[in-house]
Amino acid sequence: MAGGRGASGRGRAEPQESYSQRQDHELQALEAIYGSDFQDLRPDARGRVREPPEINLVLYPQGLAGEEVYVQVELQVKCPPTYPDVVPEIELKNAKGLSNESVNLLKSHLEELAKKQCGEVMIFELAHHVQSFLSEHNKPPPKSFHEEMLERQAQEKQQRLLEARRKEEQEQREILHEIQRRKEEIKEEKKRKEMAKQERLEITSLTNQDYASKRDPAGHRAAAILHGGSPDFVGNGKARTYSSGRSRRERQYSVCSGEPSPGSCDILHFSVGSPDQLMVHKGRCVGSDEQLGKVVYNALETATGSFVLLHEWVLQWQKMGPCLTSQEKEKIDKCKRQIQGAETEFSSLVKLSHPNIVRYFAMNSREEEDSIVIDILAEHVSGISLATHLSHSGPVPAHQLRKYTAQLLAGLDYLHSNSVVHKVLSASSVLVDAEGTVKITDYSISKRLADICKEDVFEQARVRFSDSALPYKTGKKGDVWRLGLLLLSLSQGQECGEYPVTIPSDLPADFQDFLKKCVCLDDKERWSPQQLLKHSFINPQPKLPLVEQSPEDSGGQDYIETVIPSNQLPSAAFFSETQKQFSRYFIEFEELQLLGKGAFGAVIKVQNKLDGCCYAVKRIPINPASRHFRRIKGEVTLLSRLHHENIVRYYNAWIERHERPAVPGTPPPDCTPQAQDSPATCGKTSGDTEELGSVEAAAPPPILSSSVEWSTSAERSTSTRFPVTGQDSSSDEEDEDERDGVFSQSFLPASDSDSDIIFDNEDENSKSQNQDEDCNQKDGSHEIEPSVTAEAVHYLYIQMEYCEKSTLRDTIDQGLFRDTSRLWRLFREILDGLAYIHEKGMIHRDLKPVNIFLDSDDHVKIGDFGLATDHLAFTAEGKQDDQAGDGVIKSDPSGHLTGMVGTALYVSPEVQGSTKSAYNQKVDLFSLGIIFFEMSYHPMVTASERIFVLNQLRDPTSPKFPDDFDDGEHTKQKSVISWLLNHDPAKRPTAMELLKSELLPPPQMEESELHEVLHHTLANIDGKAYRTMMSQIFCQHISPAIDYTYDSDILKGNFLIRTAKIQQLVCETIVRVFKRHGAVQLCTPLLLPRNRQIYEHNEAALFMDHSGMLVMLPFDLRVPFARYVARNNILNLKRYCIERVFRPRKLDRFHPKELLECAFDIVTSTTNSSLPTAETIYTIYEIIQEFPALQERNYSIYLNHTMLLKAILLHCGIPEDKLSQVYVILYDAVTEKLTRREVEAKFCNLSLSSNSLCRLYKFIEQKGDLQDLTPTINSLIKQKTGVAQLVKYSLKDLEDVVGLLKKLGVKLQVSINLGLVYKVQQHTGIIFQFLAFSKRRQRVVPEILAAGGRYDLLIPKFRGPQTVGPVPTAVGVSIAIDKIFAAVLNMEEPVTVSSCDLLVVSVGQMSMSRAINLTQKLWTAGITAEIMYDWSQSQEELQEYCRHHEITYVALVSDKEGSHVKVKSFEKERQTEKRVLESDLVDHVMQKLRTKVGDERNFRDASDNLAVQTLKGSFSNASGLFEIHGTTVVPNVIVLAPEKLSASTRRRHEIQVQTRLQTTLANLHQKSSEIEILAVDLPKETILQFLSLEWDADEQAFNTTVKQLLSRLPKQRYLKLVCDEIYNIKVEKKVSVLFLYSYRDDYYRILF
């Protein structure tokens, strides 16, 4: 029993131990998992008495913590002793964020789970289930409406960020994919190359055979370099050629029978008359002159790439036998001597230059087998000769003849004043260029060469008979005789060959008297050109005030009335056949049809007799004394600049004057009062109808209290005048070079110079009113004085493009509204034309259907710009001021509003009203809205209906459309019309905005088909069509002419080794400065993909690779470097680079312009320091100090800040979203791409007010010291917070930089220029320029040496897709190194630059081996040395070679010298020679070089010290030179004369010496005792001989050189005194610097 009980007890104890172990293990695991959230609730958990587990777990949602947890609960589990076989007790306490229902639900779930897990440990499973439940119910508590709003906004922001991140990731993936694809392509390309290489090795012979058989021989023929007549484009791209098929220049001469083949091209060299040898490509023959025996060719001068004319004479002989006899040789030698005499004469002719003579450039003669060819290069004149005019055009009008005569006399007088006689003045030797300028050619030399070459050299002397009936008169009076005959021929339209000369009596009296003074038989009575210039024919006394001639009037003729039939033109004037001959209108044109006539004038359809094309000629009666005439001239000037396919072209304009008998009671033509005009004559120009005129007359007049004319600009009155012409052509080229430079000047506003316009308070109708008054006055005069008197009438003729079809008014009346596609196409073309004229800063202001024409191809042509102008805005205040003197404003019966611009039904409200509001180009858009409605609406039958409908449309509140227009078919039309007719101009669109609007349907298929195909092809770069297009593009043939001219301006053939040496010296000097700052040279890749964000103005030179990808050459060195820094994650670097940058050419098929730019950049990870900027500026200051030529120019430093510029723009009312556009406009203004008026027009298109523009100019024109500008800058701080913060930040940066520059010792003037705009889109922070003012072509112009700034924000734009990390600070400067080259080259004292230190010369061929070994030793020792390749050169040739290459030392190696070498020195213009052992040569040369370098360093240090002492940074005078401050240098002057001098003479010589050497002494002065001057009475050549004296050695060597000197020169006694004095100064006194000065020749040399 006992044993049984014991057994039974052990059996019960085993499960008990198993429970406790399992419980302990679970508790340990839970504690490890939950850590601090686990709590054992047993009071004595580790006591001896074992209790069942009772724990508490604090549970949260699974995987969450912190702010994301909104719910939690505590799980209490109390286990029985037999757990886990028995379910434990479960409780949930301290629940947060859970409702009671949720807690009960969770508890029920736990109880069910516990039952299922019975028999297994389950607390962890229960806890995990609780956490899962909490995760599902983890929701934030309800929030307030404000919190929900903020949360929603945060979510939206987060969504946007996610979307942006997604797009960025997509772009990154695309970039990475493209990178990977290109890597694969590179691998495939390598494989293909290997395979292709193997194939080429196998089939090389077959390939060569195929290539030879398929090669096109025609492709190797050289094309003609110079072609004949080129097409002249007229109108809408239509080409017309001259009737003769030749260029205007070719028609100067008769056809050349012996014209060479088009492929011939000879190269000629000219030396006579030119300082440098000229190389010329001889082109095709353009004519010959039998009288002068010459042939004329076109030619191209290679150095400048300019066209010239080549006049060629051939002196021919025929040999009687195989060899020349002595007599024949003597005759040939005689001819050669005559040609040499002609060359001597020609040397003086090339110096002649006058606007009315053709310049000679060079002459050359060359001997061939049986002839001598003489060539003369002359100026190329684009025009015709008067002989051609005589043969084709007949008589020259009197007015034009007067102009020709005055210019001929001016040129002839210039020749005579220079003792040059023309000898053969005739119609063929007078040219007239395109501007009407007369130029005399073939003077003097042509007659002489013609006489030499006229007959065979060996022909026997015989009597010659002249074919001319006129005697030949010689001398200057003979030129006047021939001038009279020429003028008589021009007036008659044919050559005058009778003798004695008879002057027709029907010529004007003053012209008859003028001709008598020219062709009188007695030479003594014949007037000179100077006397003839004062004749009354040249200087007439006009009855009416004459109009000032301008370029527009250069083709002006005497007036002659048109010959329109009387039934078409009732007011046609009377004319005679003689008067008709003087009219350019009748000479050049044939009348076809009267197109229209009205108050403003008549429009006539004519045909040009020369080209056969039809034109429309507008004939306008004018009064030359009126202000309105000046206005018309200005308008014609403006209109001539327009060239667009949708604008009527204006070709020529001229004035004709005619005196006719005035019939009493008859008004002048086109001056009939409007009330008397019949409907047929008082209409308008082409296409108008009587019905339209009546409609306009019935239109209600607008409310108007003053003349509706406008002022020239927002801040100028209406009388502001703009100069007519800008600079001359050379200045334009010079300005273009400046614009194409490394950078442009700062914003320096200047007066515009585009036109000479005074826009007065007159318009078309007020002008008619004035004409009516003139007519009334004339009528009154006739009543008082009924006799017939001569009356002068002036007409302006304007030659315009002729539109054959109709006007838009005709098209509207024919039912345009039915053809919707045509309607939209025409509307788009009108918008294109308006956008063009608005871009040019002009306003039409009279836009209506009758002023919009349609050509034969049904394309729009906007015309009738009679009231167009190009001013910025108009204010009514100016109108009222100007109205005061012009009388009362009325409506005239023609339907127009007098004083009103445009027609009442189309004029915009701001023009029509009387308020003081400004208007701009949008007035045309309002008129277009009315026009577009008429295009879209059915033709209105009656005038009253049209007036009513259009007035309803002009309602100020909103347009009121007719009921039958308000349907679904016109939805887009209504939207466009409502937008255009908005009475608020700010809300009205511009033409460009409307073109880009979605309201306009896409272009029609016939217009856009090609563009669509191209767009589709370019969009699919992997398609077959794209590859085919690229293949065709790269298969283009390049002609030899294009190949030659492509880089002709770069390869000019004028290479100079000295220029290259100077460039190398400058570069080495600049690099030395950079290296002192720790910079390293770093060059970036040449090509970049096209980047529109960086280069927005298409200023980069773009190219296309074989795949069609657009790449660009570097515009500057900054952008490629920023890209390089970004891609390589560079944080700290100082680099310099001297590389080429490129500018695109305006002309096609030209090599991009190359400029050499030097860049210096500092990249640092320090972001809050201004020291890098100051160091960059200081570096440029150091470079200036290295070059004396730059120190003399007095450079100033201009600073600005991009934030300060932004603050100014914001302060001036410019919206922040338009800042980028304003930067572009200001930058274009700085680079002079836009005139000031164009800038104003572009600002106006941005809807900026005139007040904003005035404030802007007020700020950007400010510059000065920081202290002086601080009040102006501080005035911005008082503005809104954003502007104030920008100003404070920028002001602090400017103060820091200015302070650092002072600490660094920068002595240049530092100024703040608020108008400095230098690549603002690229820079962020300080920007700066180094600028000086220099005098160029009689005007002071700014010259920029360097410019730069901070560009931190440019680097992130080039970062890769996966690049992270800080962005460094970067500051850089660009230096126009070409300007430094030019400054050093143009120094008064030329800089000595040598290509090597020593030249090794072998004396004889046997010594060449020794010379080679010696040169190798010099190279090894680090001495730059050259070896003379030609050992046979003479001593003179050797010296010339050393002089040309500026080599100082020469080593002569000869076997006769044994182991010695002769070393010749050419230092300081003296020659010395010394024998040195060959083994000691290296040491000897190095010692010489060290001495030379030390002397140069001492001289440079002395100059630098002087410059630092005297440099004050002040602008001393207009030339930009520094004033020399400090102590005046007064050295010891010794005057040594051959005879005794008086005290006054000696004093005069001393003053002369000190004045002459003042500047040089100031630069060399260190101590007064170390500089002395010896003034002697010797010539310049003798002074140079003293440089051979050797005073550095002992006395014996000095005496030896003195004996050598005296043996070569006379006056030995005086020379011995000079040598003794030199010995006393240099040897005994040991004076370091001695000036040997010749007061006879004012010449000196320095003896160091």
Swiss-Prot record:
For the biological process aspect of GO, one term held by this record is:
cellular response to cold
- Tell me the impact of changing residue 1142 to L: Decreases autophosphorylation, binding to tRNA and Sindbis virus genomic RNA and eIF-2-alpha phosphorylation in amino acid-starved cells
Q: Output compositional bias ranges, type Acidic residues.
A: 730-739, 753-763
List ligand-binding residues for ATP: 595-603, 618
Q: Where in the cell is it found?
A: Cytoplasm
**Is Acetylation among this UniProt entry's keywords?**
yes
Where does the RWD domain start and stop, copy by copy?
Answer: 25-137
Where is the sequence biased in composition, kind Polar residues?
673-686, 704-722
Using the record's annotation, list all stretches that form the Protein kinase domain: 286-538, 589-1000
Instruction: Please state the Enzyme Commission number of this protein.
Output: 2.7.11.1
Please give the residue positions where the record annotates the modification N6-acetyllysine.
1258
Query: Which Pfam families does this one have?
Result: HGTP_anticodon2, Pkinase, RWD, tRNA-synt_His
Tell me what PTMs the record reports for this protein: Autophosphorylated; autophosphorylation on Thr-898 is increased upon amino acid starvation and in UV irradiation cells and inhibited in presence of IMPACT.
Summary of the knockout phenotype: Mice are viable, fertile, and exhibit no phenotypic abnormalities under standard growth conditions. Show an increase in prenatal and neonatal mortalities when essential amino acids are absent in the maternal diet during gestation. In response to nutrient deprivation, display reduced abilities to chronically down-regulate hepatic protein synthesis, resulting in preservation of liver mass relative to body size and enhanced skeletal muscle loss.
Q: Does the keyword Phosphoprotein feature in the UniProt annotation?
A: yes
Name of protein: eIF-2-alpha kinase GCN2
Q: What species is given as this protein's source?
A: Mus musculus
